[in-house]
């Protein structure tokens, strides 16, 4: 997710950087390192050595694969998406930054190839996803610690598994954790065509909630509207329509939302607040407009509106690995029942990463870029 303003940037564990040390500098075993051999390795990865424009700093490198032993797991990556948070991390504008050089990618799905003698929770053939961000999923294969992985069922679609660990988890937690919503209650959200937005629509529909979905007025507005309604959206309005006085009559027929989900900020978040029911909550999980969230004194005093933030990485820190696994299994049940699908995706071979990076940063591109290995 895009995050604006100065953030407190914690550093990912040191072993992330150790995985990419040149052979001459390695002092202990690591999951992978830059190949010191002139012969290309069979392990390829998208690596960045400093922060900046992803198209300029990300390179396709050959890495060495460490031996599998102890609690290590050899994973062949199958697919990994490019999320806004991945772009922010490469740019250096995120709340968690791995040590450099680093492999890009925080999300994806892989298949276990081999396990060390101390591994008890996974076996060859299992599908796995990262337990936490910063693992570096834009690579063909790697050796990870068992604790860095979570198993997922292999009977769900590959694209769903590859995009399971970030956006659907964020959507579910925001719908469940901030307001006690009952069937037929309304929520309102901006950036409705984003990965989180599409997951919100589907999970809300599965829970009997109504969604009011705000979009920018784009050239393909009708196509986006049809897509969201096919996912279960009840209402789709543009940013411009939301500002019009006619919205008062709209909310005579539709209950005012008790929950607003903001990924934009600026004027867009101001409009979400304006239409919230008294006592309602706006949860901010991104800032695509790179503008502050502004609430009036009257909204806070007379409507008692609540402003909250959500970051999945912090939620994971505050909850146990078993609770995250339970969340993943809950989402997998929705996928199996046909109530949660992956966002529209474009699969791009790893070697064509520049095309994927460019598409992922272009406006009005609603298809998520997924790197295939």
UniProtKB/Swiss-Prot annotation:
Any Pfam family the entry gives: ADH_zinc_N
Presequence boundaries: 1-53
SMART domains: PKS_ER
Enzyme Commission number(s) of this protein: 1.3.1.104
Modified residues (N6-acetyllysine): 61, 252, 267
Class of the enzyme per the UniProt entry, highest EC level: oxidoreductase
Catalytic-site annotation from UniProt: 94
A GO CC term attached to the entry: mitochondrion
Catalytic reactions of this protein: a 2,3-saturated acyl-[ACP] + NADP(+) = a (2E)-enoyl-[ACP] + NADPH + H(+); (2E)-butenoyl-[ACP] + NADPH + H(+) = butanoyl-[ACP] + NADP(+); (2E)-hexenoyl-[ACP] + NADPH + H(+) = hexanoyl-[ACP] + NADP(+); (2E)-octenoyl-[ACP] + NADPH + H(+) = octanoyl-[ACP] + NADP(+)
Function: Catalyzes the NADPH-dependent reduction of trans-2-enoyl thioesters in mitochondrial fatty acid synthesis (fatty acid synthesis type II). Fatty acid chain elongation in mitochondria uses acyl carrier protein (ACP) as an acyl group carrier, but the enzyme accepts both ACP and CoA thioesters as substrates in vitro. Displays a preference for medium-chain over short- and long-chain substrates. May provide the octanoyl chain used for lipoic acid biosynthesis, regulating protein lipoylation and mitochondrial respiratory activity particularly in Purkinje cells.
Protein name: Enoyl-[acyl-carrier-protein] reductase, mitochondrial
